[in-house]
């Protein structure tokens, strides 16, 4: 990938840089994890223009990237995908403390296995998030079906499998709260 978000911010937006996923759903990939000071300065203006053009903007960021702080600053709210293990639990709590619970829309546990340890951290998340207003849906189970759908460019809504009902409901909870807040 030679051109994406970085190119659009630095050299001008161009519809050809976007990948159309579905009707009214576009993806602007990040072609590099290296962002210059110039990118950071121009990013706010770029996002403000996108806010006018789009109803919703989702930034899928790698939490270890330095630019992640910039993405967090310009976001209205964050959806944090996480796992049920000690280090990820602690890291998630650190993000909540750093940005404030009011900046966090949802915390979604992914690749959940019904093990003693994961159940323990799920309960810890529940306890920690109680009364914060953060949306905390049922965890997304680790399923090979989901992995296969992703590999084939499909979503969990494009399968009739009953195994996906919990995952669909979890995402529906998050989406409905986003729409509800916007209305």
Residues covered by each model-derived region:
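P-loop NTP-binding core
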Residues: 1-183
């Amino acid at each position: 990938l030679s051109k994406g978000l970085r190119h659009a911010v630095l050299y001008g937006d161009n519809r050809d840089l976007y990948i159309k996923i579905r009707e009214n759903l576009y993806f602007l990939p990040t072609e590099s994890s290296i962002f210059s000071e110039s990118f950071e300065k121009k990013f706010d203006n770029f996002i403000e223009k996108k806010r006018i053009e789009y109803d919703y903007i989702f930034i899928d960021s790698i939490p270890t990237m330095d630019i992640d702080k910039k993405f967090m600053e310009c976001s209205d709210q964050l959806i944090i995908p996480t796992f049920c293990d000690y280090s990820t639990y602690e890291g998630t709590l650190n993000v909540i403390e750093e940005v404030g619970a009011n900046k966090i829309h949802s915390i979604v546990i992914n690749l959940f296995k019904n093990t003693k340890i994961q159940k323990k951290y799920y309960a810890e998340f529940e306890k920690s998030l109680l009364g914060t207003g953060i949306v905390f849906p049922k965890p997304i189970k680790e399923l090979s079906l989901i992995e296969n759908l992703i590999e084939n460019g499909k979503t969990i809504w494009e399968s009739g499998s009953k195994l996906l009902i919990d995952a669909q409901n979890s995402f529906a909870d998050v989406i409905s709260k986003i729409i509800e807040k916007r209305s």
